[in-house]
Amino acid sequence: FQMQELHRQYEDYCIELGIESYLLGARYSKFGYYGESFFDVKYRALEEEQQLTETLFQFLTSMTMREIKLQDEELLFESCQQFIGLWWQEGYEKGERRYRLKLH
């Protein structure tokens, strides 16, 4: 039971940060709609995106029950970056589509 509860906490927090990242991308999509390139918008949001990545990484490393090797830690950080980045991009694309369709 305890392990199942721990997994649920991991899932809930990951989902929460995925949603935050999605909403962040959607919020920044207005800049893309008004003509900024995707990469310029991504750079504009970089600090907030990095904060979400750091938050997720810190949570996952603080919840482990064993010492993490440096190599594993680097892989985990990269996974956190990809997770946050993919949800940011998904939110950005959907948000830009909403702007084009005048649904904002």
Task: Pin down the residues of each PLM region.
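Intrinsic-disorder/low-complexity detector
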Residues: 1-104
